[in-house]
Design a protein with these regions (language model features):
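NAD(P)-dependent Rossmann-like dehydrogenase/reductase catalytic/cofactor-binding core
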Residues: 193-249
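Rossmann-like NAD(P)(H) cofactor-binding subdomain of soluble oxidoreductases
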Residues: 5, 44-49, 53-121
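NAD(P)+-binding Rossmann beta1-loop-alpha1 motif at the extreme N-terminus of oxidoreductases
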Residues: 1-50, 116-117, 179-181
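Glycine-rich beta-alpha junction loops
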Residues: 24, 86-88, 108-112, 194-196, ...
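Glycine/serine-rich anion-binding loops at beta->alpha junctions
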Residues: 108-112, 157-167
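Small-residue helix-packing motif on alpha-helices
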Residues: 28, 47, 184-191, 213
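Internal alpha-helical scaffold of NAD(P)-dependent oxidoreductase catalytic cores
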Residues: 92-102, 118-155, 166-205, 246
Length: 249
């Protein structure tokens, strides 16, 4: 996820404002080769010095380690700290630092690399509205950002971050069906992607509810309703809902 954000922010034209810390020197060299103006270091504490916004993007179980490394280098009166780790909320940031601060909890998705993330942001109890606006503006550079209460970041993650995998699974299934009906894999992929893009464009441009769009292409006794009924017989809608809720258990 960190790599996707770095690429996305760099492509937005802000590369000279980014400092990246990672223990993997080879990975840092790859970023530096692609974005020469990018500041890189293997020292987490060094990276946060002078930063306006510190974004910590590691696996949740590594958060205490990384926060411990940067704690002494941070000025929590001035700097904003953002957790991009699943379930590592602003409350956990406050616990790690022993105090409240300008903390935000954000969950983006891997489409950030291409400026197409759907991100969810929540501010901590001690954070100001200005902090929320500044962090939201940062993530708006890599897609759409929705400010929510912290209890909705998890559901948002299931819909938008995990949801990407679920959409990919549907695309794969459509491709498999296309191949079975006679299309080459590349053709089936082209058809599936353009169909998905067309559906998204219809909803964005018209403001329709999905059911309205379905009605536009469904005729009595037609082939579309037969396919829709097969999806219903297979509990397609229920399966999607269960998949979204599964990660919250």
């Amino acid at each position: 996820m960190g790599g996707a954000l770095i690429h996305g922010w760099a492509k937005s034209g802000r590369v000279e404002h980014i400092a990246v810390a990672d223990k993997n020197e080879a990975l840092l060299a790859q970023f530096k080769a692609k974005y020469p103006a990018l500041a890189t270091t293997t020292d987490n504490a060094e990276a946060v010095k002078g930063a306006d916004i510190v974004v910590v993007v590691v696996k949740p179980w590594l958060m205490p380690v990384v926060l411990g490394e940067i704690k002494a280098a941070l000025d929590l009166e001035k700097q904003i700290v953002v957790s991009d780790a699943a379930n590592f909320t602003t409350g956990k940031l406050a616990e790690a630092f022993g105090r409240e601060g300008q903390f935000c909890y954000v969950i983006p998705n891997i489409a950030a690399e291409y400026g197409a993330s759907m991100s969810f942001i929540a501010k901590g109890q001690g954070a100001s509205e200005e902090t929320l606006s500044r962090v939201k503006a940062l993530y708006d550079l890599v897609g759409d950002t929705l400010a929510v209460s912290e209890n909705l970041v998890g559901p948002g993650m299931m819909m938008a971050s995990c949801g990407i995998a679920y959409v990919m699974r549907y695309i794969r299934a459509q491709m498999q069906g296309g191949c079975e009906m006679g299309f080459y894999p590349a053709q089936a992929k082209q058809i599936a992607l353009q169909t998905m893009q067309g559906a998204v464009s219809l909803l964005k441009e018209t403001g329709w509810h999905p059911e309205e769009a379905i009605d536009k292409v469904t005729t009595p006794g037609g082939v579309t309703i037969k396919g829709l009924n097969e999806l219903d017989h297979a509990d397609f809608t229920s399966a999607v809902i269960r998949s979204l809720k599964a990660g919250l258990k």
